[in-house]
Amino acid sequence: MRAFVTGGGGFIGLALARRLRERGDAVRTLVRTRTRADALDEIGCELVEGDLSSTQKLAEQMAGCDAAFHVAGVYRVGIPPSVRPAMYEANVTGTTNVLDAATAAGIPRTVAVSTINAFGNTAGRVVDETYRRPEPPEYVSFYDETKHLAHLDAEARAAAGARVVIVQPGQVYGPADHSAIGGLVRQAAAGTLRALTFPDLGLNMVHVDDVASGICLAHDRGGLGESYVLVARSRPSAS
């Protein structure tokens, strides 16, 4: 299989690229610049420079691929209003452009990486893929809003016949995680975590390598139009 991967230089995207290469797949990955793609180059990925702004360009870059994996996105919380347009372009418009490009390029199957954040705050209720966020949605961050909108777009396209499978990872952790959550995990492991801001918070953690395997399974065995939650068996508490 020849796979097209967006966000291959990111935390989840790199793990996915590694997993695909380990099982013998050819990987063409979209990067903003080759100067920061050494890890992808080392594992034998084909690098193409670009971004998510042009559907036509993306379709051209996908030509000849058998599958597409849309992993790219911006993950930040507590951002100033000035950063919101860029996040919207990456997370919402970028998803629209990738899915349109995959259709135009005739990709047999595209896996869109969403998040369990699309469910919103379930107030302790354990839900599955059939759950729908109450309307009107109450967003806890602009990131939350953009990922929910992107998820709805992917669902709508799948319902209209697009060859899309959606995955929804939980809180992902693992090596090279430079997010705020990654920092908290490292502090907790080192015994240096001094404050618990949300002592009643429950997080369903999942290792990045398991997410990469789950994404591959969604492509190989998942039903078109279906969503698959990717989480661990346990639900550890922040307390």
Give the role of each language-model region.
Residues 138-165:
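Active-site Tyr-X1-5-Lys
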Residues 3-23:
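N-terminal Rossmann NAD(P)H-binding glycine-rich loop of SDR-like oxidoreductase domains
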Residues 35-41, 45-93, 101:
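NAD(P)H-binding glycine-rich loop region in Rossmannoid oxidoreductase-like domains
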Residues 89, 93-143:
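Conserved Rossmann-fold NAD(P)-dependent oxidoreductase catalytic core, especially the SDR/UDP-sugar
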Residues 186-195, 201-235:
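Alpha-helical substrate-binding/gating segment
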Residues 148, 162, 173-183, 217-228:
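Glycine/proline-rich active-site loop of Rossmann-fold NAD(P)-dependent oxidoreductases
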Residues 160-166, 170-203:
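NAD(P)-dependent short-chain dehydrogenase/reductase
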